[in-house]
Amino acid sequence: MSEQTGTFYAVSVGPGDPELLTLQAVRVLENTPVIAAPQTASGQMLALDIARGAVDLTGKSVLPLRFTMSHDAAVRAESYRAAATAVEAELRQGRDVAMVNLGDVALFATAYYIFAEIERDGFPARMLPGVTSVAAV
């Protein structure tokens, strides 16, 4: 990317307890103007709720991302592409975006797929590891 763009952060929020967010995750969430979060069909955003238990997100833009649970890989890929496109619109405006994800973003995480799309498109991107449920017990 030649123009100044924002950075995408894939942020792990751990297995459910807001006290298990890493210091790095808290710092990035405090300093990032746009928070992206997976949203269920019923409108629930569990990862965002966990983050809110650790960080005051007042005044931040929330970008809900909808993902399919389809068994069809092409349908899932289309869902990831749509989410990446929504995030990239913010990045092009120079705004950093933190996508919250349950557990650790490097292990079976939706954020990992979005990270790969965004990185492939040439935007700066970072993964912030977190506490897994196995490590939390």
PLM features: what roles do these ranges have?
Residues M1-P18, L23-A25, E30-R126:
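Class I S-adenosyl-L-methionine
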Residues P129-A136:
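Short, flexible loop segments at boundaries between secondary-structure elements
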Residues L23, A136-V137:
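Short hydrophobic alpha-helical segments that form membrane-spanning helices or hydrophobic packing faces
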